[in-house]
Amino acid sequence: MTQSTDPQGEKGLWGARFASGPATAMAALSKSTHFDFRLARYDLAGSRAHARVLHAAGLLDDDVLTALLAGLDALEADVVSGAFVPAEEDEDVHSALERALVERVGADVGGRLRAGRSRNDQIATLLRMFLRDHARVVAGLVLDVVEALLTQAAAHPGAAMPGRTHLQHAQPVLLGHHLMAHAWPLLRDVERLRDWDARAAVSPYGSGALAGSSLGLDPVAVARELGFTRSVENSIDGTASRDVAAEFAFVAAMIGVDLSRISEEVIAWATKEFSFVTLDDAWSTGSSIMPQKKNPDVAELARGKAGRLIGDLTGLLATLKGLPLAYNRDLQEDKEPVFDAVDTLEVLLPAVAGMVATLHFHTDRMASLAPQGFALATDIAEWLVRRGVPFRDAHRISGACVRRCEERAIAEGRGVELWDLTVEDLAAISPHLAPAVRDVLSTEGSLSSRDGIGGTAPVRVAEQLEAAQDALAAHLAWARP
């Protein structure tokens, strides 16, 4: 069995009790620098804060602290410039950076930084720092999609379209009302990120491997320097829990689902059969064999990536479900799912925002279909209710009107809608159906009548747009201060 040429006792962080280094295959399995080195700057920030609390506890003198901070600053410059990258034998981001620091300031100085901390509390803290930063980035990008939806809604204040349930015509609604039905879930996703951030703003630093530290260090000072609001109450919980990562993965998956629902509609709307929208050339692709094709690839990729984001969440939850306290090496698998979720959203969201912002809506086509498919049947029922007819009877009478339309359509060989019913047709169905019922059989009348809070009446949609714009501004102040 081949063994590593780098015994951990010489260059790593843990090898003194071992007679030899790990097997080559073991080292390859254990290695994580290929994905966790993106945490390097957070690791260095944590090391600066840790050096200061070691100094405050009397464990570092002034000269050593100065040398450590200078070495960490120089190392960060090399990380940022690319002059420093992990070596093949480096196990993880922590060991890579400690090796580099020791090379710069010497073992006597660099080796003192390890006191009072473990990779267990380090990585738990760094992951929170990374996710908190990227939560704001993701939130800002989600809000770009919201802004695109609201801009389209504002640009089409009176445009009507078919509202659907079960994908069948249901009732007319305003296009703006429909678009904002996608905006509100995305605004809630940003609320979830903000709520999540309050829970993530608790620092595990100082928890050590699991039991805390006996060196008189000040975890609160580290937490404050790293942008946290406080330290964890329980050191075992601090090192062993990953609900913060799982919750972030859930919000990411929920964002993916919400984008997928928008995208599914765009895909349908762009078909010849619907002809509700034309996609902008910049957000479409073509075919290698069919010259006429204009494909909604942004929307299709959004649908596909929603599944990927759900997979990130379920994979992480499956990793966590059977772990006893405290830290277990399984937790090395916590990072790639959330890294992937971040990377996926940060490339997907700008494309969805661009697609939505440049959609060209064919409002005449949408308006012509808004009342079709007997979509005004509920208006007949509610007209009857306003005249004292019990809704059970009103529902039956309105349904009979639909059936009469279908009977005439078969007999006449053409489409017959509710407004095509004659006075005689209506009277034959029910004496309650006076000729005045025809006054409600219009898209405009139907829309205007839905004037309860949250309804699709133009006045309510205008109020809703203002409220959504206010929410957008408030969230942007958090995401992009």
Swiss-Prot record:
Gene3D superfamilies, per the entry: Fumarase/aspartase (C-terminal domain), Fumarase/aspartase (Central domain), Fumarase/aspartase (N-terminal domain)
Entries under SUPFAM superfamilies matching the protein: L-aspartase-like
GO biological process: arginine biosynthetic process via ornithine; L-arginine biosynthetic process
One GO cellular component term noted in the UniProt record for this chain: cytosol
EC number(s) given by UniProt: 4.3.2.1
Reaction it catalyzes: 2-(N(omega)-L-arginino)succinate = fumarate + L-arginine
Keywords: Amino-acid biosynthesis, Arginine biosynthesis, Cytoplasm, Lyase
Compartmental location: Cytoplasm
Family membership: Belongs to the lyase 1 family. Argininosuccinate lyase subfamily.
PANTHER family cross-referenced by the UniProt entry: ARGININOSUCCINATE LYASE
HAMAP family per record: Arg_succ_lyase
Protein name: Argininosuccinate lyase
Primary gene name: argH
